[in-house]
Amino acid sequence: MRGIIKRLNDDGFGILYNKILVPFSAPGDEVEVLKTEKQKRAKIATEWRLLRSSPIRVGARCKVFGKCGGCILQHINYNSQLEFKKEKLRKILGREVEIIPSPRIFGHRNRIDLAVTVNAIGFREKGKWWSVVDVEECPVFGKTSKKAIERLREYIEEEKVSTWKIREDSGFLRYMVLREGKFTGEIMVNFVTKEGELPDPTSYFDFADSIYWSINRSKSDVSYGDIEKYWGKEFIMEELDGVKYLIHPNSFFQTNSYQAVNLVKTVEKFVEGEKVVDMYSGVGTFGVYLAKKGMKVVGFDSNAFAIEMANKNAEINNVEAEFFVASDREVDIKGFDTVIVDPPRAGLHPKLVKRLNDHGPETIVYVSCNPKTFKVNIEQLNNYIIEELIALDMFPHTPHIELVGKLRRLV
């Protein structure tokens, strides 16, 4: 079947004749689909030819683009990526939303999780959990990835390290997680293994500031486990607009440090008053930043380790912010000027929505990684109206987008 790709779906797949999804295609491409496969409710083109390129198509910087499942939009020029995301938001939210572009579109990621198998070191092939695409480097992470992967290959060969056979679920070394403070240059390497003995990696990774070893004792395919520091610093550090953050292997942190600066600045701009409650606070990314700007912050999260890290981050920045373990259903939100919510993709818990409607402050700042649940929650928060809404491209070359909304109380 031949035809021209008219548009992309929300996941970044080209749509041919409204019935076949063509991965790694671009609007305006003329394609010939040779083979399809039924997946869930759609037909996916598993083999296709590009007959004529779209004017918005560019050469992908990554050598394994089209195989690796990470950067599905890297073949589309960046302005067109932003237009795609604007149209996606327009369709979901029914309104125009300004998008702040990422300051960098390569070398911006501060974390990658490299699968380490007998056949390849790299990332999952698109749609194939059992297949890993071998890579020499990751352009969205940057130059350090090339050095780290080269050293990892040397380490495996010279120390005769057993690696992962995915289908058999055998082998010792499963993942190497690489993290980098983009504004500090500090590097952390975390080896994720099954039970056994880890040959000393320190001479191979002498460029790292911190080396960790995590043992995954479960049957789950995850890149974390029971953890211990092997060598070097307990934490590496990242810095956003003069505010310091400690990074631990088990910490969640915004993966695009350069755009995270714009994110915290946007949240600060939307906050009204001095007394702020930081829901879903994580490691204190927003709360510590706002406290550094002179606001009185109390934060809550259900993850005890995240709260421990948030309090450490408050301490190293010498700010008066306190963080406590609590679920989103328990927190007393009375007496604050602004509530910040940054929920998981599933959105706000219904009990929190009710409490916000009944007793919420004048202002809510809603940070969302899922426009669809954002829309649902905004409709449920019927005592509030959107006063300002900005999107940030935290994830270049992917279909994902971050939203920050300022909500003002009506009654």
Swiss-Prot record:
GO terms for biological process: tRNA methylation. GO terms for molecular function: 4 iron, 4 sulfur cluster binding; metal ion binding; tRNA (uracil(54)-C5)-methyltransferase activity, S-adenosyl methionine-dependent. S-adenosyl-L-methionine binds at Q254, Y280, T285, D301, S302, D328, D342. PROSITE patterns: SAM_MT_RNA_M5U (PS51687), TRMA_1 (PS01230), TRMA_2 (PS01231). Keywords: 4Fe-4S, Iron, Iron-sulfur, Metal-binding, Methyltransferase, S-adenosyl-L-methionine, Transferase, tRNA processing. [4Fe-4S] cluster binds at C62, C68, C71, C138. Its EC number is 2.1.1.35. NCBIfam families: rumA (TIGR00479). This is tRNA (uracil(54)-C(5))-methyltransferase. The lineage of its organism: Archaea, Methanobacteriati, Methanobacteriota, Thermococci, Thermococcales.
